[in-house]
């Protein structure tokens, strides 16, 4: 009995040891194809897996992952990825708009207002950010 349990444990360990992560380039390509097909759940899954593998280093994919998370009604995840895009200064106005939208969906009104103000400071005159401000003042 002990040998059977040991054999099963050894097989599981070997399987995990030799398991390979999905190819990052393939994840990005699959995610982009899913995004173009408006399959936001699939795109979100591919992009978030890629970002986990690469330690959230890709600002473009982080932004796209935020868009997908927003489309599938996952505001906490959208906030995380839009925040990465803001920190890396990618597509800054839209990243701030996405971040603010996620905060609004999470009913974090003070942070929502602060994000819009921060977005306007970083993007003076942005029409979308400017149009959101009268709604909160």
Give the ranges of each region predicted by the language model:
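Start-of-helix register in tetratricopeptide repeats
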Residues: 25, 59-60, 94, 128
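Register position in tetratricopeptide repeats
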Residues: 36-37, 70-72, 105-106, 135-137
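Canonical positions in the second alpha-helix
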Residues: 50-51, 84-85, 118-119
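Short coil turns that delineate tetratricopeptide repeat
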Residues: 55-56, 90, 124
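Canonical tetratricopeptide repeat
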Residues: 63-64, 98, 128, 132
